[in-house]
Amino acid sequence: SIETDETEWLKHLQTPLFAWAAVGEIPPNISLDPSLKINLKDVPLIKCPPWLGIDRALAAWGAFQKSIQSCTMNPNGLLIADAGTVLSLTRIKANGEFLGGQLVPGLGLQLQSMTKGTKNLQYPSNQNYPSESFPISTEAAMLKGSIQSLLGTIIEAKQISQVPVWLCGGDSPIILKNLQNRNIE
């Protein structure tokens, strides 16, 4: 079963945590051993700026390590697209050097922004991606436009960087499906 309460989810872990990282506040009802916390200094990205989020650093380092281990590292590096609350694009060289990135509101933030920033738009109750190019319903149009903006950001960054894209994050399944529908790998 899928747990939405982090406390309940943590109770079901079969093995103890050997390390953890977090962006933002830890809920007060979750108890984590501070000695197991991964900090930015623990992630060996070259030229990693001190302000980089631990989520971006770990995603970049994970993609870098997987590329090295699988012998699929592109000579020009990688582009990591972490499609979560924020779509973060992180570019790294083939030697693991941080090259920068881009940040765009994720799907949920885009939909929330339209809902909160306008008088008559409601947060879509149906999260199914519309198949039509220009949907009639407002909810479908909001979803289509938001997802298209994420796809466009990723596609353009891939074209500019000319490197493989590693996709992760909560919105990655819908983004992957739409990239595959366009024959983009």
Indicate residue ranges for each PLM-predicted region.
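Short beta-strand scaffold segments in enzyme catalytic cores
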Residues: 1, 78-81, 87-92
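Nucleotide/phosphate-binding catalytic cleft detector across ATP-hydrolyzing
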Residues: 1-78, 97-185
